[in-house]
Structures are given as C-alpha cells and as structure tokens.
Design a protein with these regions (language model features):
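Non-heme Fe(II)/2-oxoglutarate
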Residues: 131-134, 168-173, 177-270
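Secondary-structure boundary elements
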Residues: 49-58, 92-97, 105-113, 125
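Active-site rim elements
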Residues: 31-37, 88-90, 150-163, 182-187
C-alpha cells in the first residue's frame, strides 16, 4: 500500500486513478473518513449556507487532489494552467448562477508548488460563451458541465489570471462560471520527498435544487461507496469516468469502510 512517509510507495502501480489536475475522484475516496470529517466542519457548511441563504444543504461526495513531487519523476507533473483553462457549467444547459465549488486546502501553497488559478470576473462574461462557440457547444450535451478554452481565447485576454496562495486549512470558493484551472508553479521546488499539494474538494448546494430520485441515489451511494462530482443537486457517478473504468479492469483498490455518519452528516446526504 501507500505510506505517507515513504515516497517510494507512491509509484504508479499503487497510486489511485487520477484525472486532470491530479484529482483522485473515485475508488471510494468520496466516502473516506477524511472527506466526511471535512464536510462536518461547521465553518465549511456555514460558508455555503451564507452563499445560498439556506441551511438545508446537500454535500457533494467529491474526492481529493494530491500532487506527487515531480522533482522525483517528471511525468508526475500535472497539466500546466494555460492548457486546460475551463468552466464547470454548461453555458446553454445551465444559464445563470447554479453552483459554487469549493476546496479545503491541506498543505500551504508556494510559488514553486503552484495551485488553483482563477480569471477574476470571468463569470460575468459567461453569458457570451454560446455566441462565441456555437459549433463546439452544439457538440457538447447540455448535461456535460466541462468546457475548455483555447489559449488565445478573447475571454482570457486583458485579465491576468491569479494563482491562489492558500494556507493549510483555508477554504476557497468560486462560482462554477468562473474560468479556472490548477497549475504547477513557475519555479522548481527544492524537495522531492513530500506531496506538493493536497486539497479536499467539497461543494454544497440547497436541497431544494434536487429531487427525491436523486436523493435516493445519494443514500445508496453512501452504502456502496460511490463518489460523485461537485454537482450535489444531480447524481453523477465519478466511478463511471472512462479512465476510472479502464483502471478498474486491471487494478483492484482497497476501499474504505462504509462511513458511520452522525446527524449532521446524514442531513448532508439528504
């Protein structure tokens, strides 16, 4: 297995399936004790409740992002920021404000290690995207909430992206219409025996945005250790991502135990 204190155990054969940006979305991670602990922290729920002006929330069953030190193995380096600037909301399928995403930062960031990159104010130009990319959007089903921008996109011109410096324990929230990504730093870290980045992904949305059918699936997901995306008003199974399915054909991962939830956590399930 993987030993946090021994980088020799972080090899590709043992490391869980990762998707863009070093996100580990599946294999039961969404129901690990660590993820449920973070969702149960009062300040996390209070932040989302303040945004939505609603205390009755549903949590995502999101995973985490862990960056292995690419000073150790170059192919561990994650996507450079300009290569995958994106939004996580379909401009036609979901116009307007629908979701505020979040993460709890677990390791203090640095210019060398990198982190989240945001284009300030870009959510205000979200409504213009269908006119700029009618052909591309026509090929993307309205239920697919991931849209990438080319490096020379006019929506990226004139506004300097910012990289978010976060202390351990900080909560970062952003509107899903915001153009963003994550990126390694511009400098070379001086160490190769520690994780460069560790975050817990968390998103909470009002229960009123969902429905009984989705909530029934969510309850079953807890028992079956099924992780999801950030959209807690719908049910999107992260274990069905194509690269996760392919990895599961050749590798068996030990899943965490079924969580024993307290009252607050159970309410966040629905």
């Amino acid at each position: 297995g993987i030993d946090r204190s021994d980088p020799e155990t972080w090899d590709d054969d043992r490391w869980p399936t990762a998707v863009h940006g070093g996100i580990l979305p599946s294999h039961g991670i969404g129901h690990s004790a660590a993820q449920w602990y973070i969702r149960d922290r009062a300040p996390v729920k209070q932040a989302f409740a303040a945004i939505w002006q609603d205390e009755d929330l549903l949590t995502s069953f999101d995973g985490v992002a862990l960056w292995r030190p690419w000073t150790r193995h170059g192919h561990w380096r994650t996507n450079n920021g300009p290569s995958w600037m994106h939004i996580d909301q379909h401009p036609i399928g979901r116009p307007g404000k629908h979701c505020v995403q979040g993460l709890v930062n677990l390791l203090t960031t640095s210019p060398a290690c990198g982190g989240n990159v945001m284009v300030p104010g870009s959510h205000k130009r979200f409504a213009a995207i269908p006119e700029l990319y009618p052909e591309r959007l026509a090929r993307i089903h309205p239920s697919i909430d991931h849209f990438r921008f080319p490096n020379d996109d006019e929506l990226l011109a004139g506004t300097e992206p910012i990289i978010c410096h976060l202390e351990a324990g900080d909560l970062l929230l952003w509107d899903s219409r915001t153009i963003h990504c994550s990126s390694p730093g511009l400098e070379t870290p001086s160490f190769n025996d520690q994780l460069f980045r560790a975050i817990s992904l968390v998103c909470m949305m009002p229960k009123s945005k969902s429905n009984d059918k989705v909530i029934a699936k969510r309850r079953a997901a807890v028992e079956n250790l099924v992780s999801t995306t950030n959209w807690s008003d719908r049910f999107i199974n992260a274990d069905e991502f194509p690269n996760v399915v392919e990895a599961s054909k050749v590798t068996t991962f030990k899943l965490p135990p079924v969580p024993e939830l307290n009252k607050n956590q159970t309410e966040l399930v629905g």
